[in-house]
Amino acid sequence: MSKRTTYCGLVTEELLNQKVTLKGWVHNRRDLGGLIFVDLRDREGIVQIVFNPDFSEEALSVAETVRSEYVVEVEGTVTKRDPDTVNSKIKTGQVEVQVSNISIINKSETPPFSINEENQNVDENIRLKYRYLDLRRPELAQTFKMRHQTTRAIREYLDNNGFFDIETPVLTKSTPEGARDYLVPSRVHEGEFYALPQSPQLFKQLLMISGFDKYYQIVKCFRDEDLRADRQPEFTQVDIEMSFVDQEDVIQMGEEMLRKVVKDVKGIDVSGPFPRMTYEEAMRRYGSDKPDTRFEMELKDVSQLGREMDFKVFKDTVENNGEVKAIVAKGAADNYTRKDMDALTEFVNIYGAKGLAWVKVVDDGLSGPIARFFEDSNVATLKDLTQAESGDLVMFVADKPNVVAQSLGALRIKIAKELGLIDENKLNFLWVTDWPLLEYDEDAKRYVAAHHPFTSPKQEDISKLDSEPQNAQANAYDIVLNGYELGGGSIRIADGELQEKMFEVLGFTKEQAREQFGFLLDAFKYGAPPHGGIALGLDRLVMLLTNRTNLRDTIAFPKTASATCLLTDAPGEVSDKQLEELSLRIRH
């Protein structure tokens, strides 16, 4: 077997008239009777190779036996293609390789789906079962090349700015906050369990107390939660922590790193500083704490109509401390039928809204089911509050503020997608700041941390923990990209007494706090520096940089929506002996 001289996807005009040795997979084969053309593929791309009896009758006879996905080695000379056969869609499209010798390294059975097509109609379960074949597709190969470029850019930036790459434990202690833990039973300590980390949060804080000053890690994290298109049970996090910093320092670092990533991976210069928006403003204007700012259609408060109109739904809502908000789909009045509006009503029902009121703005006023409730003065108020014009579709939700925000925020995205308002080539970064420190859990009847229990309140709000904890703001910041939460960070609590107070507000007894987090409270006794950081979802970042819509396309061997691996059939049963060693028994 000869040594490969270059990759298939790197054979360009620079190699004209040179001999090359290539190895790869048969992507496509065309027999034109006397001449055989093969597209040979490897991770760098595809090159056309030609079997011509004038060059080698022996090679031609072997080529007659090869089929799709055979692994072959070829030797040949790079020549220029005829002008009428140039393929401008690929970087090797100006040349071809005249083959003088071919060896079949390994044969292939007929794959369960075609590798040389987009496979949009192939059942995803089939793709995941044969993931090693799915990953051969040039489209996915390019995605993982960009993933590598992304991690390389991140490491380069952090390495060049004084960060240490330090690993933290994978087997750790289960803590009650956040999502469910994946538990690992201990054989040595009967009846006791490790947990796989949801985040290296506490360890990175301990590393700051240890004096390492700047830490990072590209790390696997695990959460046993219900899945959706942008969630996986195991995911990769870019974890960063810094000592002696404030919020501005972390934000500046995050922006510099992300600008380098986008420049290195996509060749795009992202201007800075990134826009910022408070949590309150994001919820008020977009109905989301991760707003997609690539298009307008902001939520407009029209509660004034509830005080002026004789429309019971609006009126009762406002009188009961609710609110009425609207979104305006510009020029979309003719795009939606009554049946379409019924479907949109069902959509907002998912988010708790009792209904969706709507009107279409026409030249002489309004049309639609509730148009009759609008006096001329009400129409004027509506237009003044929303800037609605003739041809626009106006949709209203009247309910409790959180229901209004969630339902209209989701509807805003749905309408924008249906009307094609989103520029998929845009990268709109946004910082969301000034988060509430706490959220009230109606089921548990207690406060829970909006981010996590180690987030510091703003200095001026520390006193509120005793009297009005619901009004305390966090020293927290999220980075949003195109409507997705890319990452979140905060300045951490670095004082033992304040951390104990935070646990108390969250409903922990002193004994519970000591039992679960005693090691952290002890560490605070030995001189903790002020510190803060951020964690970015690498899988999600790659998904957005590659214009993917499914997180699974950015993970080499992902799980399904039900957290199974169709390739390996994980999770699976284990033997009685294994269970016995762990002192476990399965109860059906």
Swiss-Prot record:
The gene is aspS. Residues 201-204 are annotated as: Aspartate. Keywords: Aminoacyl-tRNA synthetase, ATP-binding, Cytoplasm, Ligase, Nucleotide-binding, Protein biosynthesis. It comes from Staphylococcus haemolyticus (strain JCSC1435). GO terms for molecular function: aspartate-tRNA ligase activity; ATP binding; catalytic activity, acting on a protein; nucleic acid binding; transferase activity. Gene3D superfamilies: Bira Bifunctional Protein, Domain 2 (3.30.930.10), GAD-like domain (3.30.1360.30), Nucleic acid-binding proteins (2.40.50.140). It comes from the Bacteria. Disulfide bonds: none annotated. L-aspartate binds at residues 177, 223, 451, 492. This is Aspartate--tRNA ligase. InterPro entries: Aa-tRNA-synt_II, aa-tRNA-synth_II, aa-tRNA-synth_II/BPL/LPL, Asp-tRNA-ligase_1, Asp-tRNA-ligase_1_N, Asp/Asn-tRNA-synth_IIb, AspRS_core, GAD-like_sf. Catalyzes the attachment of L-aspartate to tRNA(Asp) in a two-step reaction: L-aspartate is first activated by ATP to form Asp-AMP and then transferred to the acceptor end of tRNA(Asp). GO terms for biological process: aspartyl-tRNA aminoacylation. It catalyses: tRNA(Asp) + L-aspartate + ATP = L-aspartyl-tRNA(Asp) + AMP + diphosphate. It is found in: Cytoplasm. It is an enzyme of class 6 (ligase). Pfam families: GAD, tRNA-synt_2, tRNA_anti-codon. Its EC number is 6.1.1.12.
